[in-house]
Regions:
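Glycan-recognition surfaces
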Residues: 3-109
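Solvent-exposed beta-strand/loop surfaces of large extracellular or lumenal domains
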Residues: 184-206
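Generic recognition of flexible, low-complexity loop/linker segments
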Residues: 5-6, 79-80, 87, 138-143, ...
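Active/binding-pocket-proximal capping segment
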Residues: 106-121, 169-176, 180-192
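C-terminal beta-strand-rich structural cap/linker in extracellular carbohydrate-active enzymes
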Residues: 200-231
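Aromatic- and carboxylate-lined catalytic core of secreted/periplasmic carbohydrate-active enzymes
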Residues: 88-133, 225-230
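Flexible loop/turn segments at secondary-structure boundaries
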Residues: 23-28, 99-101, 106-113, 160-164, ...
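Carbohydrate-binding surface patches
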Residues: 91-94, 99, 134-181, 220-222, ...
Length: 231
């Protein structure tokens, strides 16, 4: 392929970008460093999130996905911070590159601060997987185990007009409605953007949250220890 020729000619220090998944093929994997999962756009939609999210097993492993540039000033819903929080969260969770459509001169201090909350993107070859991929009509829960005692959990309300209850069984099979935690252990769950401790839960319990319209709730899950912990 043309990507093989480019890779061989430019060498292993080059980063080759495959323009668009629409015209892309797995035949280019191993030669391209990144791949677009959507056409030209500067917004984020539920369809974009799902397209990248359901390819979690490839993302950061064999290729880096991006959903084209994102305009922070167009984030929806626009009447709360949930819009930009959602844009940043789901770009991080379901892609592995965030291209800005804005120059820094158009962003205020709060925008720059929020950007700083998600950078740097992690570099290891693993992405959050949709934990409800085979049990719901649309993937709304993403999880990634960072260590044996620390996991990342993301609830995503794709509806920008109405709140929505989202839940996940903390133990159980990942991808089939479970988060894969140990049923006999206790866990602290901390809400990142809302900056609060949600509570302590048994691994055999179900976590249910009511999300505001268009909210992405990013949570840290830590196994309870007998010593003070940073959540």
């Amino acid at each position: 392929t043309i990507f093989k020729l480019a890779s061989e000619g430019l060498g292993n220090k080059a980063y080759i970008h495959e323009r668009n998944l629409k015209y892309g093929s797995d035949i280019a994997l191993g030669y391209v460093a990144s791949q677009r999962t959507w056409g030209d756009t500067d917004v984020i939609t539920p369809e974009m999130v799902a397209r990248s999210g359901l390819r979690w097993y490839k993302n950061r492993v064999v290729v880096n996905y991006d959903m084209d540039a994102k305009n922070l000033l167009k984030a929806q819903p626009a009447d709360s911070e949930d819009g930009i929080n959602k844009l940043l969260t789901m770009s991080y969770v379901t892609a592995s590159r965030l291209l800005l459509a804005n120059s820094f001169g158009t962003l205020d201090a709060e925008h720059v601060y929020k950007l700083s909350r998600i950078y740097p993107f992690h570099q290891f070859a693993r992405s959050a997987r949709p934990l409800d991929a085979f049990t719901t009509d649309y993937p709304r829960v993403y999880g990634m185990k960072l260590t044996d005692k620390w996991s990342s959990l993301t609830f995503f309300n794709e509806d920008e007009e109405h709140p929505q209850k989202i839940s996940i069984k903390l133990s159980g099979i990942e991808g089939r409605g479970g988060a894969g935690l140990h049923p006999d252990k206790q866990y602290y769950i901390y809400d990142f953007w809302n900056d609060k401790l949600i509570g302590t839960f048994g691994g055999n319990e179900t976590l249910e949250q009511e999300l505001r319209k268009g909210e992405a709730r990013q949570m840290a899950v830590r196994e309870v220890e007998s010593n003070p912990q940073v959540l």
